[in-house]
């Protein structure tokens, strides 16, 4: 809904001329099946849709702008669409799609799923208590709960958006790899680049090697990971990054390690906020490009959070996850893990059992476990208290970051 409103504000001609707006994934579903299909997961997390209630009452949209009162029917095509979950059959390929993709015409198509969320079954996450940590340019944190808790500052809270019978929660950090890349592009001196070249390494690997020689707290630095604002749990994009403790003796690898630690402290703070609501986060599964390229970073995550980090060497976790969703939708009589009844209503328990079975048999099994180092964890516990003070002070008490951004000439 937010995207449609943005288009309305920026280009009213496009908005008025559009018959309706579709998620790219929903457009693909329509092309593949020839049906008006909508992804229930996308609608839940991005469109304020609910399975039993549908979209919010017209009055909510009318409060934003009178002409938006009937946006679900007028611009989202909600009236005649079928809302399908990723573990449900949406249809089969049309003849044209089957011919173009060189697949059988009876190949089933399931509901679409958001990219990071699709990795859940690929990593064996089909129950509450497990966390999916997707580390890339930014970081996605996806977990499940057995009951609904209204946790402030999360990206989404939606019933059954990821897995049957469970409440899906999503949080995140707006800058992880982007923050590190910014530092390397703008603040790493030439002599570091030269030494990296002489060693036959890229600058990321070289800096990680140098940073690994440092003990926690040895650099005397503490940073906030808000280089692109705070996504969770302050949900404030006007906040900015901070490094405390810089001096004339500070070296590039010390700043680099401080940024790695800041990202880990940010994840721990999110975990802390969530666990206060009674949602246990016991098992951390990580994937994404950085997780396989930077062992130091993964060890810092473990040392800071005090939790084991299970890093999966699965380069296409979302693709594998969608294959698992499809296998759960396919009846066992046809080689899948679903119930014998291809059509007709099924309980959420039956769907959950099918998805769990598919995941157990098809999930990634190539992984490495990073275990917290007790000595380092004790130091990070103390540093974490100072991180929380900075977090609370600059995030909620002192608005100097926003004031600096607002000052214009």
Describe the role of every protein-language-model region.
Residues 16-18, 22, 80-81, 101-112:
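Short loop-beta-helix segment that forms the pyridoxal 5′-phosphate
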Residues 4, 12-13, 22, 35, ...:
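Glycine/Thr-rich phosphate-binding loops that ligate phosphate moieties of nucleotide
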Residues 94-103, 113-130:
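Conserved phosphate-binding catalytic cores of ATP/NTP-utilizing and phosphoryl-transfer enzymes
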Residues 118-122, 139-143, 223:
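Short beta-strand scaffold segments in enzyme catalytic cores
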Residues 74-77, 81-90, 107-110, 122:
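Accessory "access/gating" subregions that flank catalytic or transport cores
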Residues 1-7:
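Single conserved hydrophobic/aromatic residue that forms the stacking wall/gate
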């Amino acid at each position: 809904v937010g995207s449609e409103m943005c288009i309305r504000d920026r280009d009213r001609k496009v908005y008025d001329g559009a018959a309706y707006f579709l998620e790219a994934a929903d457009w693909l579903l329509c092309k593949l099946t020839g049906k008006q299909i909508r992804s229930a997961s996308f609608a839940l997390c991005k469109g304020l849709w609910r399975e039993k209630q549908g979209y919010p009452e017209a009055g909510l949209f009318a409060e934003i702008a009178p002409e938006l009162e009937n946006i679900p029917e007028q611009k989202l095509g909600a009236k005649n669409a079928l809302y399908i979950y990723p573990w449900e059959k949406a249809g089969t390929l049309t003849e044209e799609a089957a011919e173009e993709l060189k697949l059988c015409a009876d190949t089933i198509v399931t509901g679409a799923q958001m990219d990071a969320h699709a990795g859940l079954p690929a990593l064996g996450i089909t129950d509450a208590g497990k966390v999916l940590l997707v580390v890339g340019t930014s970081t996605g944190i996806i977990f499940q709960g057995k009951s609904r808790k209204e946790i402030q500052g999360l990206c989404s809270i939606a019933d059954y958006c990821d897995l049957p019978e469970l409440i899906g929660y999503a949080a995140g950090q707006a800058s992880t790899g982007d923050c590190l890349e910014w530092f390397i592009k703008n603040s790493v001196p030439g002599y570091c680049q030269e030494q990296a070249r002489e060693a036959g390494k890229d600058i990321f690997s070289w800096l990680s090697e140098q940073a690994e020689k440092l003990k926690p707290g040895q650099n005397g630095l503490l940073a906030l990971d808000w280089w692109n604002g705070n996504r969770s749990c302050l949900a404030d994009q006007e906040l900015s990054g901070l490094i405390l403790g810089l001096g004339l003796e500070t070296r590039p690898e010390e700043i680099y390690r401080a940024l790695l630690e800041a990202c880990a402290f940010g994840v721990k703070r999110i975990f802390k906020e969530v666990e206060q609501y009674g949602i246990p986060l016991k098992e951390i599964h990580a994937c994404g490009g950085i997780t396989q390229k930077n062992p130091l970073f993964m060890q810092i995550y473990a040392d800071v959070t005090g939790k084991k980090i299970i890093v999966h060497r699965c380069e296409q976790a979302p693709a594998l996850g969608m294959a698992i969703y499809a296998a759960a939708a396919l009846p066992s009589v046809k080689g899948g893990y679903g119930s014998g009844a291809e059509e007709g209503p099924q309980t959420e328990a039956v769907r959950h059992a099918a998805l769990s079975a598919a995941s157990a048999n098809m999930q990634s099994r190539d992984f490495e476990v990073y275990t917290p180092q007790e000595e380092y964890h004790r130091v990070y516990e103390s540093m974490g208290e100072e991180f929380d003070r900075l977090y609370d002070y600059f995030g909620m008490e002192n608005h100097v970051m926003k004031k600096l951004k607002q000052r214009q000439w």
